[in-house]
């Protein structure tokens, strides 16, 4: 009876086309701020529940009926019940006695909070069990998360089955699920067809309700809120031991055996010890367990031990059938879902690792997690929507939490339908068709998609080329580059910049040499070798990463007090004025016509997206949106570039004539100033035409158009370079925020993130150096931690693995400066007298130790 889950095979092309029609209509409704299609909000008026079949359970139970002041989202002191944001909750008013084999009739309206899953009963349904109890409605707790199993489970409705047979003469099951109603509504078919069960109209209207002030931007904020909060749900999955009798593996090493799969420690792992492509994990499931989710914990830093493709089989004995085939994102550190939404018990589930990254021979898995239907999927937790959780989302503040909860439920339904067809739309869909364009308009919703990461990985893998047969060797003079950075006017052609030295060094030496295509596998993590003139380094990756960091700093300097040494980007007006948001950002220079180099910048961005390296470019969302193909708007995006101008035009639009003439007189002409301080005419001869009061609307539109398109050609060149390296389908699947993060890394370097990425070697757990190290990093600012990260790894953003060893001189020195080797991302940590001294030495090294002397080898070439 359940509809196809994400990634499931749809029953027919008719069903696929119907869902695409639905998505197009829903996308238009979302963009326009209209209610979503009614089929998406379907709630059956009647659902039957019975006691869960548990031989050890009681033969009857008393089900308390709770009453609230209307449906709400809070739990009061009276007990675990749905409630409202105002007024006290009432305690349980009565109880329904339910014996094994008997049923209780409820509506299909559900609510989930911290106490569990609730279903609603109408006055008529209550009367069947309690007579005239005086309640207008009541709520039953179907299951609690802590109970480990559902007390009540839904069943088919015999009355509905009988009525359908009498009415249509066909033995149809009633359509009770919203997915089926969507298919019935939007899929064209001949002949008789099932009919949906009677809808609970009041619940449908509550789901469809859109507040008068609600906009598409509110939906986007709600999606980001869910993305930020639901990302942690997999951390709370039940222990595998609840559902599995035993776990067998194909092979294992003595130190990293099968117990590491269930120890809830991401630092340990099971490692195989066998033949290539012959690795498996076999789960013997406990009787009655139905898998809702099966997740594997993987880590991209395992390199060629990381699984790349997993196939899951299930069944009984040796009669196993293929259930799923999953490609894993090679950049992932965390959980990947390899099986979900099973409807029957599978005695045996076998996870076969058919391919590892870079054709690795053995595999590492850091954990297995299971969510079972014995512990029913409760759904979205209404407790999320408390005012304290909404502070970062001003558009959502002030909206009734009940409204936010229902809207979120509806958006999750939309995402589920989108997931079921996404692999049909990307990458094979014709981009010229209107339907695809409409779905792209709601790209931010892809954040919640479960299918997208696998599709992105597949598109990148299918378009990658083999690694180059040789590694380019570049000779870089950073002393000249630093002199140029200090005074760019002495070198107008920017020949001494690291950027130019690398660009020229990578040019093919003759017509037979192919230029780099940057589409190599992610494992190929050093694109060229650097020889820094007059610096001690043998480049095994650290010098290369340093060259990328130097180019990033030249393109978009991190300090507002230094000149911009290259002509490709200029500071935003916000940075120059010290006003508005995003005061450290840059935009492409409208005057720079060197499109070949812009295209190369785009290629470097694509290479960073494909690999593990970063090109840190401080560009506002206004630019990233254009690169990823998302729409930009004046009111939403341009304040990050020039907030003063946006405000000025807004005020000008509402001015009366007297104020306008007093403010501008005859001085305002049809011209505007671009980000590079170039004055351009908005109309032919505009510099000599005064803007009158009646012309102001036209003037405003012309200014907005000119500024929005000021760097259109430069962005187009960058995008052309990006698309030479990354398929269009990948840009279609990534939001602009994700594109920025994949190219530039995560600007927030938190201590928690560093803890996950740091490995201490040859240290005792009680060693004071470990304690002092973390105390020091806790006292660092984000900028300090970013500088420290670059000192150790050559990267200034996460993720980047760090290996820490004791100082080479051991106990002979105290309070010395730390040393690092960026090629191996290694820090050599000395002894310190206190955490304060440790903090001072680490900070000094992070800001002052630029040359990479510890990479010098005694064997010179």
UniProtKB/Swiss-Prot annotation:
Residues 512-857 form the HECT domain. Keywords: Acetylation, Cytoplasm, Phosphoprotein, Transferase, Ubl conjugation pathway. SMART domains: APC10 (SM01337), HECTc (SM00119). Changing residue 823 to A: Loss of ubiquitin-ligase activity. InterPro entries: APC_su10/DOC_dom (IPR004939), Galactose-bd-like_sf (IPR008979), HECT_dom (IPR000569), Hect_E3_ubiquitin_ligase (IPR035983), HECTD3 (IPR042469). It comes from the Eukaryota. The active site is at residue 823. One of its GO terms (biological process) is proteasome-mediated ubiquitin-dependent protein catabolic process. Its EC number is 2.3.2.26. Gene3D superfamilies: Galactose-binding domain-like (2.60.120.260), Hect, E3 ligase catalytic domain (3.30.2410.10), Hect, E3 ligase catalytic domains (3.90.1750.10). Pathway: Protein modification; protein ubiquitination. The modification N-acetylalanine is found at residue 2. It catalyses: S-ubiquitinyl-[E2 ubiquitin-conjugating enzyme]-L-cysteine + [acceptor protein]-L-lysine = [E2 ubiquitin-conjugating enzyme]-L-cysteine + N(6)-ubiquitinyl-[acceptor protein]-L-lysine. It is an enzyme of class 2 (transferase). Residues 219-397 form the DOC domain. One of its GO terms (cellular component) is perinuclear region of cytoplasm. It is found in: Cytoplasm, Perinuclear region. CDD domains: APC10-HECTD3. E3 ubiquitin ligases accepts ubiquitin from an E2 ubiquitin-conjugating enzyme in the form of a thioester and then directly transfers the ubiquitin to targeted substrates. Mediates ubiquitination of TRIOBP and its subsequent proteasomal degradation, thus facilitating cell cycle progression by regulating the turn-over of TRIOBP. Mediates also ubiquitination of STX8. Interacts with TRIOBP. Interacts with STX8. This is E3 ubiquitin-protein ligase HECTD3. It comes from Homo sapiens (Human).
């Amino acid at each position: 009876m359940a509809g196809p889950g994400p990634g499931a095979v749809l029953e027919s092309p008719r069903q696929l086309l119907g869902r695409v029609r639905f998505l197009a209509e829903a996308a238009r409704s979302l963009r326009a701020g209209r209610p979503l299609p009614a089929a998406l909000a379907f709630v059956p008026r009647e659902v039957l529940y019975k006691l869960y079949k548990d031989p050890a359970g009681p033969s009857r139970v008393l089900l308390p009926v709770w009453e609230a002041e209307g449906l709400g989202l809070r739990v009061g002191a009276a007990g675990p019940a749905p409630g409202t944001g105002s007024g006290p909750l009432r305690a349980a008013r009565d109880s329904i006695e339910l014996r094994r084999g008997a049923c209780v009739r409820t509506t299909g309206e559900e609510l989930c909070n911290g106490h569990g899953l609730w279903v609603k009963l109408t006055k008529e349904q209550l009367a069947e069990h309690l007579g005239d109890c005086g309640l207008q409605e009541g709520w039953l707790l179907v299951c609690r998360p802590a109970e480990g199993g559902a007390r009540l489970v839904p069943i088919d409705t015999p009355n509905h089955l009988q009525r359908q047979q009498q009415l249509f003469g066909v033995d149809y099951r009633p359509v009770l699920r919203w997915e089926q109603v969507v298919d019935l509504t939007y899929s064209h078919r001949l002949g008789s067809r099932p009919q949906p069960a009677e809808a609970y109209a009041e619940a449908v209207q509550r789901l469809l309700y859109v507040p008068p002030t609600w906009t598409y931007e509110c939906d986007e904020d709600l999606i980001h809120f869910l993305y930020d909060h639901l990302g942690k749900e997999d951390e709370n999955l039940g222990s595998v031991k609840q559902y599995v009798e035993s776990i067998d593996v194909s092979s294992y090493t003595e130190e990293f055996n099968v117990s590491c799969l269930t120890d809830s420690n991401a630092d340990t792992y099971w490692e195989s010890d066998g033949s290539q492509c012959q690795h498996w994990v076999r789960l013997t499931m406990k009787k009655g367990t139905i898998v809702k989710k099966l997740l594997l914990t993987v880590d991209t830093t395992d390199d060629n031990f990381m699984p790349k493709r997993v196939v899951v089989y299930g069944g009984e004995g040796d009669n196993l059938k293929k259930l799923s085939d999953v490609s894993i994102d090679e950049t992932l550190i965390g959980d990947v879902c390899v099986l979900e939404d099973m409807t029957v018990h599978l005695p045996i589930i076998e996870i076969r690792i058919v391919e590892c990254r870079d054709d690795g021979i053995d595999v590492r898995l850091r954990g297995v997690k299971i969510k079972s239907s014995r512990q029913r999927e409760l759904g979205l937790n209404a407790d999320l929507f408390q005012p304290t959780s909404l502070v970062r989302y001003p558009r959502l503040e002030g909206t009734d939490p009940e409204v936010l909860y229902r809207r979120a439920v509806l958006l999750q339904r939309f995402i589920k339908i989108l997931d079921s067809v996404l692999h049909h739309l990307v990458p094979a869909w014709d981009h010229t068709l209107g339907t695809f364009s409409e779905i792209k308009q709601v790209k931010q919703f892809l954040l919640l998609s479960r299918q997208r990461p696998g599709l992105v990985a597949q598109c990148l893998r299918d378009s990658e080329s083999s690694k180059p047969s040789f590694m380019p060797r570049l000779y870089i003079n950073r002393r000249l580059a630093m002199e140029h950075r200090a005074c760019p006017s002495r070198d107008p052609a920017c020949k001494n910049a690291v950027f130019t030295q690398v660009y020229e060094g990578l040019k093919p030496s003759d017509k037979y040499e192919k230029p780099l295509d940057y589409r190599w596998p992610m494992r190929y993590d050093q694109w060229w070798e650097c020889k820094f003139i007059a610096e001690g380094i043998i480049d095994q990756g650290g010098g290369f990463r340093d060259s990328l960091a130097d180019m990033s700093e030249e393109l978009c300097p991190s300090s507002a007090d230094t000149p911009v040494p290259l002509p490709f980007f200029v500071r935003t007006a916000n940075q120059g004025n010290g006003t508005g948001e995003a005061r450290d950002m840059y935009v492409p220079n409208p005057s720079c016509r060197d499109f070949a180099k812009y295209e190369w910048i785009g290629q470097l961005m694509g290479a960073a997206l494909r690999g593990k390296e970063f090109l840190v470019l401080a560009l506002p969302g206004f630019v990233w949106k254009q690169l990823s193909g998302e729409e930009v708007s004046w009111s939403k995006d341009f304040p990050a570039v020039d907030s003063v101008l946006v405000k000025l035009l807004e005020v000008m639009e509402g001015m009366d004539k007297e104020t306008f003439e007093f403010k501008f007189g005859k001085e305002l002409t049809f011209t505007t100033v671009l980000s590079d301080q170039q004055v351009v005419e908005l109309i032919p001869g505009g510099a000599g035409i005064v803007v009158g009061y009646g012309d102001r609307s036209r003037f405003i539109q012309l200014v907005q158009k000119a500024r929005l398109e000021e760097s259109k050609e430069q962005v187009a060149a960058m995008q052309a370079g990006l698309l030479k390296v990354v398929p269009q389908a990948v840009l279609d699947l990534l939001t602009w925020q994700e594109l920025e993060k994949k190219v530039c890394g995560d600007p927030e370097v938190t201590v928690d993130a560093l803890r996950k990425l740091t490995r201490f070697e040859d240290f005792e757990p009680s060693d004071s150096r470990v304690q002092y190290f973390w105390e020091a990093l806790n006292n660092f600012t984000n900028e300090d931690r970013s500088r420290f990260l670059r000192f150790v790894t050559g990267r200034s953003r996460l993720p980047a693995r760090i290996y820490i060893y004791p100082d080479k001189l051991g106990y002979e020195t105290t309070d010395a400066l730390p040393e690092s080797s960026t090629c191996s991302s290694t820090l050599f940590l000395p002894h310190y007298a206190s955490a304060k001294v440790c903090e001072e030495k680490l900070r000094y090294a992070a800001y002052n130790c630029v040359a990479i002397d510890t990479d010098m080898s005694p064997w010179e070439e």
